[in-house]
């Protein structure tokens, strides 16, 4: 969320700190609260970052998705796309962080697609339409296709970061 050096610094700080806290053994809620507090305290200027966290459990064939101000994600299963969307503020805005959590059962061949708000722009309906019609051989091809479509929609007016991540369940 945001552009330029400041947004890059806030994003890197959030990602690195969150990952380190999770690796040290903190649960997601506690780590999110700590990162949010750090974001609030680190600057007198507005400092914020969106979070889109994905935790896979291969034993139970589930994924947990946590979102904090992030753009929608999508599950592509058997040619049908489901949308994972959550209403929550980015980290660094409110005193209390409220990460939306979803748990999804996944099967072999399912593709999980997550994008930044620079990809969705003002709406994400076009992504659902693309997922219904585009037949990707692999997740990399799908991610590249969505990125190309987003660039075409922006008509050269790139205003935000444009990130697409696609993962396939094997």
Regions found by a protein language model. Name each.
Residues 2-25, 85, 95, 106, ...:
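Active-site-proximal, acidic helix/loop segment immediately C-terminal to a metal-coordinating Asp/Glu
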Residues 5-78, 85, 151-160, 167:
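Catalytic core of PPM/PP2C metal-dependent serine/threonine phosphatase domains
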Residues 46-48, 92-98, 147:
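Short gly/ser/thr-rich secondary-structure transition/capping motifs
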Residues 63, 81, 99-101:
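Tryptophan-centered short beta-strand motifs
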Residues 86-87, 93, 169:
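Active-site donor-binding loop signature of nucleotide-sugar glycosyltransferases
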Residues 88-90, 98-100, 105-106:
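Conserved, helical-rich catalytic subdomain that frames metal- and/or nucleotide-binding sites
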Residues 113-115, 163-167:
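Conserved active-site loop/cleft motifs that coordinate metal ions or position small ligands
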Residues 146-148, 166-170:
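Terminal helices and disordered tails flanking the catalytic cores of nucleotide-processing hydrolases
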